[in-house]
Structures are given as structure tokens and as C-alpha cells.
Amino acid sequence: SQIAEGFAREAGWQAFSAGTKPEVEVNPFAVTVMAEIGIDISHHIPQSVNEFLNEDFELVATVCDNAQKSCPVFTGNCEHIIHHGFPDPANATGSDYEITEVYRQVRDAIQVWVTELRKFKFL
């Protein structure tokens, strides 16, 4: 979700990444592959979805394969909830090169998806 937040912010949206079980820091592979295309997410801080329950949102998007199961309902205030499952690159195994390639593939897929979302009137 940090990658999706990076693309959303790059598109000029106010965006926040939050998870049901946030990590302590942004995955360094995600930071690397986003830096490759000129987007700095090194300053992002993983947050819990619970931090946003009292906020109003136009759109809440879940992006991980397991998010639909572990976070089926966002109980905060939002107009639209959408889900698009992407493989979790944190599950990649192999050499650093192989793991980086998985992150690139997921990054590129998320970039296409965020670009498509821009076509909807609620964004």
C-alpha cells in the first residue's frame, strides 16, 4: 500500500496508506523500486487503519491479496470502497535481484491501476 500511496500522492491526491497489521518501517525494496522512477517513499511511516476511523474519505482502496479477508469493512466514513488484489511483494523469495524484480512487477501493476482510477469522477 505504500507504493499505491506514492503513486496517488504523485498524482496530486491526498493519500494515506494504512494496514491492519502495519510494519515498523517501509520495506526497503519498495523504497528502492519507487526511487527508480523518481518517487520518494522513504519518509512514509506505516500506520494502522484504526488511526483513520474518525476521518472522512471520498475513497478507501484496499490493494493486498489478503486485505479483503482481514479488512472486509472499513468502519470509518467514506463514500466509496474499492478493492484490487495485488500479490504482496513482501512474500517474495530468492536473491535480492529476484525480490526486486517482484517489487518492480507489483509497482508497475499498481501504477497502471492508479492511472485507471483517475478516470473515475470521484477522484
Regions found by a protein language model. Give the residues of each.
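Conserved active-site segments centered on acidic
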Residues: 1-50
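Short amphipathic alpha-helices and their capping/turn segments at secondary-structure boundaries
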Residues: 48-52, 70-73
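Alpha-helix C-terminal capping/helix-to-coil transition sites in glycosyltransferase folds
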Residues: 54-56
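Redox-cofactor binding/interface segments in oxidoreductases and associated redox assembly factors
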Residues: 62-63, 83
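Short glycine-rich anion-binding loops that position phosphate/pyrophosphate groups of nucleotides
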Residues: 65-68
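Phosphate-binding/catalytic loops
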Residues: 70-123
